[in-house]
């Protein structure tokens, strides 16, 4: 069904219609992007899925009779016993709850997180199936309604107040939206600024999501669920820096750490809307508003350029090479040099209207 022009000019929706049609055609071919060969690593890259664990990959062994493995073995058994009780009693606990059951034994939260991921991978089940949840940090706003697992009706709006991403994405039902696109915003500050500038109403109907930086599992699950349910165009708005690009890649292609859950988390159809490094020159953004790449930034950029999915994204590679050559990065806030509401009033509407994504 084609989108009816409401609010913004008809051409805006025509562009989205064309993009949506191409996405659906790609889906019928079996993926979110044109088919291309993947690279076999410990995690394999496939265009239609992202980074996923290869069958029969290298395994980590923990032996109960090995002095080096005693503590890890004990930690795994401890968490497995907690999971068993949770499943048996049909109750749930957060990762933080599990950490505080014996904080001295675990040492820190990261240890718990990694073991839970290992158990989920070992049993080949999503983390929610282990009855382990985590507090969502993401936010959502725009044209969206749904019912949570406990029956709570949630009605997101296009106003200045966002709704927290649900902690149990699998449990939400009766999802309703008329949105023409989904915009993923890297940073909370940018997300809030767009809400304050009435962007959602101006470009209505749409949905906006932010993971407040590196997205948590629930935010990624929500984006995936919205894509699977509605197949509307999904765009990302990130800083023109290596960190922002990596966050965008996590949404689109996933991460090595969660490659065993790639089918539930990745959205390869995601497009990069902005801020593009090429936009910096095109918009004549002054050099004194830019930030030099640090050595760490350059290492991160080199790392991303070597990843297998970059080979099937020549336009992304070109943008990253522009950044590498200039040795400069820019935050989205650099656009305020042009005007305080340039992002919401000019930049994003024009990008969406004229298909300025890659």
Show the residue positions of the predicted features.
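Nucleic-acid enzyme cleavage-core boundary/entry regions
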Residues: 1-233, 242-358
């Amino acid at each position: 069904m084609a989108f009816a022009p409401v609010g913004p000019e008809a051409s805006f929706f025509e562009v989205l219609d064309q993009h949506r049609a191409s996405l659906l055609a790609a889906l019928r071919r079996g993926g979110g992007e044109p088919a291309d060969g993947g690279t076999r690593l410990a995690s394999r890259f496939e265009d239609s899925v992202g980074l996923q664990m290869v069958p029969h990959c290298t395994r980590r062994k923990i032996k109960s009779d090995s002095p080096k493995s005693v503590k890890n073995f004990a930690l795994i058994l401890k968490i497995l016993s907690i999971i068993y009780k949770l499943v048996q009693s049909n109750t749930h606990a957060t990762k933080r709850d599990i950490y505080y059951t014996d904080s001295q034994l675990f040492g820190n939260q990261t240890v718990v997180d990694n073991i839970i991921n290992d158990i989920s991978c070992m049993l080949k089940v999503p983390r929610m199936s282990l009855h382990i949840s985590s507090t969502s940090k993401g936010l959502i706003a725009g044209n969206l309604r749904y019912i949570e697992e406990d029956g709570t009706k949630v009605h997101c709006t296009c106003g200045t107040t966002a709704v927290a991403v649900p902690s149990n994405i699998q449990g939400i039902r009766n999802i309703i939206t008329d949105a023409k696109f989904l915009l993923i915003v890297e940073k909370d500050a940018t997300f809030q600024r767009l809400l304050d500038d009435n962007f959602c109403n101006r470009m209505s109907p749409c949905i906006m999501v932010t993971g407040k930086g590196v997205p948590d599992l629930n935010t990624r699950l929500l984006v995936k669920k919205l894509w699977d349910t509605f197949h509307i165009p999904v765009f990302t708005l990130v800083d023109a820096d290596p960190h922002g690009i990596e966050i965008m890649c996590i949404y689109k292609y996933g991460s090595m750490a969660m490659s065993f859950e790639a089918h539930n988390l990745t959205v390869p159809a995601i497009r990069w809307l902005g801020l593009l490094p090429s936009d910096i020159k095109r918009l004549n953004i002054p050099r004194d508003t830019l930030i030099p790449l640090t050595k760490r930034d350059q290492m991160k950029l080199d790392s991303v350029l070597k990843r297998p999915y970059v080979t099937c994204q020549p336009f992304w590679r070109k943008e990253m090479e522009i950044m590498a050559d200039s040795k400069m990065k820019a935050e989205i806030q650099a656009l305020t040099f042009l005007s305080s509401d340039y992002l919401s009033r000019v930049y994003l509407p024009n990008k969406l209207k004229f298909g300025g994504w890659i």
